[in-house]
């Protein structure tokens, strides 16, 4: 399908601009006439000169003028010099001697009107015409952006460009299950008669759900690319405008265009922009533009397509829980395909896809990079590869090395290294104790994740240091002891400050907030406390966007007080436990702090080595948690 967008005309070929220029020229032309229809002296003159009234009278007295025209406020005197006629113009002043002087010198004189009907009329009409022209210009621009004319404002044809993507399933790695779910969609589009002969009904819609950056749009393009069918793509927000009824009209145009080129695919990205549930919290939302657009979408999905010329709707969202139930029923979106974050093998495959065209050194180990990036989506991995290439180029390297990839991972997780942010030795010491506390507790707590690196170099917007914990695999479930372990690790920084410096700082504010949220989830959502038992008190907001827990109160004031007391007591209990552990390993932490102060960065291996050496020197039983007992 050829793009329907017409090429823009040059600015000076715009009808409105031409009309304005024509009006200006017309004004100048009409001003050249006198009120009786004859050409004015100004138009016939070769030149005009503005002079004083005294000079005009002097010219008359010296017989240097031939004709004089007297107006209400102006006086004109004409004089012919050879083939040239000169007009002298002056402001008129009350003077009873002027006419006798003209009679005495026998100079022709007459009166003239300083305005005429045409210019007076244009003086009234021009402001109206200018305002009308500007209004038409703005309305025309708005209508073009909306894809329609004055009487076809809702047309979406100019917004729709069919494409045939060259993306294939081989270009998308890390989501094999999702690809398997949509492979038969390709078969439906290629051979619709095979299924029609069997009496099978082709799915009308497939909803792709998952966290941001996991490749939902790429998967939709791959389906169209494999099936070799037209691909119509629009964002959910593209349907909504300020004019009521415009969204519904665009939906009609989109489906009408797709049906003309069937078999084809319609892809609606971020469908939650128009597909949000019409009943929010038990209250019906207003009959607004979004609701009309949704109703039209529901009607179109009920009545379009045939078995021999199918049109399949693919849609993507990371907020499936807010979609309208009518949109999710069978017959509309028959299937939901989860496009989740990749596991270890998936991350390796995604990295292999994105390193194509990147010059890699021999020391690059993609498996190690995949271990460091658990929990990251495909878009994050693509960004890491690109960031590593940029780092290599910035360092004037000819190849991307493993160190560049590791640095890119740290940038993605912890933020940009702030070498220019100078902190005082006192603050540096506080940060060193804080991060050492996190690291030691992480290595000595069952269910926590292994330490990969400890740094006191500022990164990101606010972090003055960080402890990089990298689980080797994504976590889909967490046991109670793992949640407790995470709380202990978060409290380790604050506890180290109090144990070793005997004073606390503001650096643990985010740690305390996260620890509180974990316990709140245990009480109100996971049923892991005596306060709520198995009762769920709050609902999780969004599984894919990490929205935390709902703020709606579905419990009594007494229960709220018990929740607050439970959270406070558990935090205090874990805090005392962490402080005792750090006190037991005081000398090991002092060694760690000294190395951090000198080197600014130490590895996880060095952290474990310091703890092991301290335990061996003091004949202590090892409290280091083996790798197999840590969260993986």
Swiss-Prot record:
Listed CDD domains: RecA-like_FtsH
Cofactor, how bound (note): Binds 1 zinc ion per subunit.
Binding annotation for Zn(2+): 434, 438, 511
GO BP: protein catabolic process; proteolysis
Binding-site list for ATP: 210-217
Segments on the Periplasmic side according to the record's topology features: 31-116
Domain of life: Bacteria
SUPFAM superfamilies in alphabetical order: FtsH protease domain-like, P-loop containing nucleoside triphosphate hydrolases
Main location: membrane
InterPro entries hit by this protein: AAA+_ATPase, AAA_lid_3, ATP-dep_Zn_Metalloprotease, ATPase_AAA_core, ATPase_AAA_CS, FtsH, P-loop_NTPase, Pept_M41_FtsH_extracell
PROSITE patterns, per database record: AAA (PS00674)
An example Gene Ontology molecular-function term: ATP binding
GO cellular component, one term: plasma membrane
Pfam families: AAA (PF00004), AAA_lid_3 (PF17862), FtsH_ext (PF06480), Peptidase_M41 (PF01434)
Enzyme Commission number(s) from the entry: 3.4.24.-
Cofactor requirements of the protein: Zn(2+)
Compartments, record wording: Cell inner membrane
Keywords recorded for this protein, A-Z: ATP-binding, Cell inner membrane, Cell membrane, Hydrolase, Membrane, Metal-binding, Metalloprotease, Nucleotide-binding, Protease, Transmembrane, Transmembrane helix, Zinc
Ranges per topology, Cytoplasmic: 1-9, 138-632
Membrane topology reported for the UniProt record: Multi-pass membrane protein
Membrane spanning residue stretches: 10-30, 117-137
Active-site residues, record numbering mapped to chain: 435
Family: In the central section; belongs to the AAA ATPase family. In the C-terminal section; belongs to the peptidase M41 family.
Described function: Acts as a processive, ATP-dependent zinc metallopeptidase for both cytoplasmic and membrane proteins. Plays a role in the quality control of integral membrane proteins.
Description of how the protein assembles with itself and partners: Homohexamer.
Name of the protein described by the UniProt record: ATP-dependent zinc metalloprotease FtsH
Species the sequence originates in: Helicobacter pylori (strain J99 / ATCC 700824) (Campylobacter pylori J99)
């Amino acid at each position: 399908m050829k793009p329907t967008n017409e090429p823009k005309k040059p600015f000076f070929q715009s009808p409105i601009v031409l009309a304005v220029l024509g009006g200006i020229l017309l004004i100048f032309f009409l001003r050249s006439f006198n009120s009786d229809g004859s050409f004015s002296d100004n138009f016939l003159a070769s030149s005009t000169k503005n002079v004083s009234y005294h000079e005009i009278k002097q010219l008359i007295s010296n017989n240097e003028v031939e004709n004089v025209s007297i107006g209400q406020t102006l006086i004109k005197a004409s004089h012919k010099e050879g083939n040239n006629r000169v007009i002298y113009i002056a402001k008129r002043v009350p003077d009873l001697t002027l006419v006798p002087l003209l009679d005495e010198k026998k100079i022709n004189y007459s009166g003239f009107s300083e305005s005429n009907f045409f210019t007076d009329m244009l003086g009234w009409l021009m402001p109206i015409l200018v305002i009308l022209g500007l209004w038409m210009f703005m309305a025309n621009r708005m209508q073009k952006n909306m894809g329609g004319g004055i009487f076809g404002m809702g047309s979406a044809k100019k917004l729709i460009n069919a494409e045939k993507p060259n993306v294939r399933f081989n270009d998308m790695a890390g989501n094999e299950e999702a690809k398997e779910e949509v492979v038969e969609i390709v078969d439906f589009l290629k051979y619709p008669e095979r299924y029609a002969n069997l009496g099978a009904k082709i799915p009308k819609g497939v909803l792709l759900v998952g966290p941001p950056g996991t490749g939902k749009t790429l998967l939709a393009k791959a389906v169209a690319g494999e099936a070799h069918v037209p691909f119509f793509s629009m964002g959910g927000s593209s349907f909504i405008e300020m004019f009521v009824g415009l969204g519904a009209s665009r939906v009609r145009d989109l489906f009408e265009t797709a049906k003309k080129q069937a078999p084809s695919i319609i892809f609606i990205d971020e469908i939650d922009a128009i597909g949000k549930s019409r009943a929010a919290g038990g209250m019906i939302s207003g009959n607004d533009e979004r609701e009309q657009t949704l109703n039209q979408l529901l009607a179109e999905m009920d009545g379009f397509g045939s078995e021999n010329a199918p049109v399949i709707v693919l849609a993507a969202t990371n907020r499936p829980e807010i979609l309208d139930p009518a949109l999710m029923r069978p017959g509309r979106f028959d299937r939901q395909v989860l496009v989740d974050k990749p596991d270890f093998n998936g991350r390796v495959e995604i990295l292999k896809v994105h390193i194509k065209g990147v010059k890699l050194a021999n020391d690059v180990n993609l498996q190690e990079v995949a271990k460091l990036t658990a929990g990251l989506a495909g878009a994050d991995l693509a960004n890491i590869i690109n960031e590593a290439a940029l780092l290599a180029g910035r360092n004037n390297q000819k190849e991307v090395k493993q160190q560049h990839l590791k640095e890119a991972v740290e940038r993605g997780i912890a933020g940009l290294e702030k070498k220019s942010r100078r902190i005082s030795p006192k603050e540096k010491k506080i940060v060193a104790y804080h991060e050492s506390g996190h690291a030691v507790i992480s290595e000595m707590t069952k269910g926590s994740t292994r330490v990969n690196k400890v740094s006191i170099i500022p990164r990101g917007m606010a972090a003055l240091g960080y402890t990089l914990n990298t689980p080797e695999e994504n976590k889909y479930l967490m046991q109670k002891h793992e949640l407790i372990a995470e709380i202990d690790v978060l409290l380790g920084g604050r506890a180290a400050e109090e144990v070793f410096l005997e004073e606390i700082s503001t650096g643990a504010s985010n740690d305390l907030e996260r620890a509180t949220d974990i316990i709140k989830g245990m009480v109100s959502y996971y049923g892991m406390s005596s306060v709520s038992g198995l009762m769920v008190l709050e609902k999780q907001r969004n599984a894919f966007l990490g929205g935390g827990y709902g703020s709606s109160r579905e419990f009594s004031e007494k229960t709220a007080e018990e929740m607050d007391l439970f959270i406070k007591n558990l935090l205090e209990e874990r805090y005392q436990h962490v402080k005792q552990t750090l006190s037991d390993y005081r000398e090991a932490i002092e060694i760690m702090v000294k190395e951090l102060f000198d080197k600014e960065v130490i590895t996880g291996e060095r952290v474990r080595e310091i703890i092991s050496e301290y335990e061996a020197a003091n004949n202590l039983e090892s409290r280091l948690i083996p790798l197999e007992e840590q969260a993986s």
